[in-house]
Curated annotation (Swiss-Prot):
It catalyses: (7R)-7-(4-carboxybutanamido)cephalosporanate + H2O = (7R)-7-aminocephalosporanate + glutarate; an N-terminal (5-L-glutamyl)-[peptide] + an alpha-amino acid = 5-L-glutamyl amino acid + an N-terminal L-alpha-aminoacyl-[peptide]; glutathione + H2O = L-cysteinylglycine + L-glutamate; an S-substituted glutathione + H2O = an S-substituted L-cysteinylglycine + L-glutamate. Belongs to the gamma-glutamyltransferase family. PROSITE patterns: G_GLU_TRANSPEPTIDASE. SUPFAM superfamilies: N-terminal nucleophile aminohydrolases (Ntn hydrolases) (SSF56235). PANTHER family: GLUTATHIONE HYDROLASE, GLUTATHIONE HYDROLASE PROENZYME. GO terms for biological process: glutathione catabolic process; response to antibiotic. The gene is acyI. Besides the cephalosporin acylase I activity which converts GL-7ACA into 7-ACA; this enzyme displays some gamma glutamyltranspeptidase activity. It comes from the Bacteria. InterPro entries: GGT_bact, GGT_CS, GGT_lsub_C, GGT_peptidase, GGT_ssub, Ntn_hydrolases_N. This is Acylase ACY 1 proenzyme. GO terms for molecular function: glutaryl-7-aminocephalosporanic-acid acylase activity; glutathione hydrolase activity; leukotriene C4 gamma-glutamyl transferase activity. The active site is at T368 (nucleophile). Its EC number is 3.5.1.93, 2.3.2.2, 3.4.19.13.
Length: 558
């Protein structure tokens, strides 16, 4: 990207972290040890795909509350030849799942997924068929260069040696201590003596290290047809879960073509349904393109108002039109059409917040992780993966160290809707592993955790970079806003005068200490260097690679 040009700002802020700069590779993840794992693989001769997979496995150790091999997600890959592919390894509903399997408690905005006894949140009945391990191994087999056993070594070592607990991890354990205490394995691992692990304590995961070694020897078959899979299905059968051996054997990843849109001279590329990000980020950018956003000033009343209205429009359409395309006909062409954006934009009122309904016919948890990796050959990976809620279903499969997802929470527990449960149906997601091109060359790649707040936050980072001319570090750390049609959340750095002006326009404003999770990103500069950035909302750390080998023919003499 070109150097940022200063533009007016109403909401001012100071970045808490510093970017990294490199020329031969960049790894940015939400934990420094995972970034180091990816960098280690790049230095060993691996490419960006090898490094991304190594980082993801390391994150299953260092961020056990966020991601695991029993989870799912999306990996957006740009290959050195310019091809883009999205690997969909999202979890699926078990074959025994039904649309009526949970007792619903509410249909209010924000409470639609509430069920009796939180059965779609904690426990065996909340677990969907995992896709993470198969997806990561498939990415490595198709596009990587190193064997799985080598790529797994950093994670195995991390699990065996242990690592120092960060305040962020300790806080996550504390926040979920009640649910964790109900599972013997997680209680022993995370609540020694009945108390949460504290910052500075060491977390060792011996059982999980053994599971990773088994995967290194047997590949994904260790889970989808072997010992680890039997441990999972035995636990499910004994505890009211639905996953069986047939579910594991029948699970398939999907290779998908990304959604492509345009915004002020950039090509914006993101994942297609069942992710909502590619479609609805494109839709919202099409709406915003009709305004001179940059001249309004970052964080101004008008700029925030337009973001809020665009978000409400997208969420209204998303609720009725976007789901697993194998089960629901998704009107992608209509949603990303600039003419449709013109129709929706014409209904926006600058001085009045509106309630929006869908313009056509037709819930997730915030606890996810993201990696962004680039190598010297031109391969780029933007991958978002999760076990869904904090520590997933708060279930550890005995003897394996594996933490199960609670992906069933992402379905609408009410029957007869686009997002209702059906056997084999892929979960719906807001994951937004995004990339942008300028004149055919990659300009930036980014992503973050945060559930329903993911794609709105990714949208804001794109607007920050293109309209507000922010640096990459500023774009990922800038204060965010969010709404799906109810309250309008404003992070604390948005000025109170702006909040009051938005209230006067009819917005239901609430303050939030944090909207979504820790974004990480890579910018590709005209001089061939890479800039990596991670934000204050997580333990994110960029690790850059520069330098290189000695000049050809160089000798050491004395």
């Amino acid at each position: 990207m070109n150097a940022p040009v200063p533009v007016p700002r109403v909401a001012d802020f100071t970045c808490e972290k510093k970017p990294a700069s490199g020329s031969r590779g960049m790894v940015v993840t939400n934990h420094p040890l995972a970034s180091a794992a990816g960098a280690q693989i790049l230095l060993a001769g691996g490419n960006a795909i090898d490094a991304a997979v190594a980082s993801l496995f390391a994150l299953t150790v260092a961020e056990p509350m966020m991601v695991g091999i029993l989870g799912g997600g999306l990996s957006h890959i740009r290959l050195a030849d310019g091809r883009h592919v999205v690997i969909d390894n999202l979890s699926t509903a078990p074959g025994k799942a039904t649309a009526e399997m949970y007792e619903c408690l509410s249909d209010e905005i924000g409470k639609q997924r509430d069920t009796r006894d939180r059965q779609n949140v904690v426990g065996a009945k909340a677990v969907a068929v995992p896709g993470a391990l198969k997806g990561w191994c498939e990415a490595l087999a198709r596009f990587g260069t190193l064997p799985l056993a080598e790529v797994l070594q950093p994670a195995i070592g991390l699990a065996e040696r242990g690592f120092v607990v960060t305040p962020y991890l300790s806080n996550c354990i504390t926040d979920n201590a009640g649910d964790l205490a109900r599972d013997p394995g997680l209680a022993a691992m995370l609540l020694p003596g009945g108390k949460p692990l504290q910052p500075g304590m060491r977390l060792v995961q011996s059982d999980y290290a053994a599971s990773l070694k088994l995967i290194a020897a047997e590949g994904p078959d260790a889970l989808y047809g072997g010992k680890l899979g039997r441990a999972l299905t035995d636990y499910m059968a004994a505890n009211g879960g639905l996953i069986d051996q047939a579910d594991l054997a029948n699970y398939r990843i999907e290779l998908r073509e990304p959604i492509r849109g345009s915004y002020r001279g950039y090509e914006i590329i993101g994942p297609p349904p069942p992710s909502s990000s590619g479609v609805h980020i494109t839709q919202m950018l099409n709406i915003l393109e009709g305004y001179d956003i940059g001249s309004l000033g970052f964080g101004s009343t008008d700029a925030v108002h337009l973001l809020a209205e665009a978000l409400k429009i997208a969420f209204a359409d998303r609720a009725v039109a976007t789901a697993d395309p194998a089960f629901v006909k998704v009107p992608v062409a209509r949603l990303i059409d600039k003419a449709y954006a013109d129709e929706r934009r014409a209904l926006i009122e600058m001085e009045q917040a509106k309630s929006w309904t869908a313009g056509l016919s037709g819930g997730e948890s915030a606890d996810t992780t993201h990696v962004t990796v680039a190598d010297a050959m031109g391969n780029v990976v933007s991958a978002t993966q999760t076990i869904n809620g904090l520590f997933g279903a708060c279930v550890q499969i005995p003897g394996t160290g594996m933490i199960a997802n609670n992906y069933m929470y992402n379905f609408d527990p009410h029957p007869g809707r686009a997002l209702s449960i059906a056997p084999g149906k892929r979960v719906f997601t807001s994951m937004a592993p995004m990339m942008a091109l300028k004149e055919g060359r990659i300009a930036f790649a980014l992503g973050l955790p945060g559930a329903l707040r993911i794609f709105p936050s990714a949208l804001q980072a794109i607007v920050n970079l293109i309209d507000h001319r922010m640096s990459l570090q500023e774009a990922v750390e800038a204060p965010r806003v969010w709404t799906e049609g109810g309250v309008l959340e404003l992070e604390e750095a948005i000025p109170e005068a702006v909040a009051q002006a938005l209230i006067a326009r009819g917005h239901k404003v609430v303050r939030s200490p944090r909207v979504a999770g820790g974004m990480n990103a890579i910018a590709f500069n005209p001089d061939g260097t890479l800039t990596g950035a991670a934000c204050w909302r997580a333990d994110g750390t960029p690790v850059a690679i520069s330098g290189g080998l000695a000049r050809a023919g160089a000798r050491f003499t004395i």
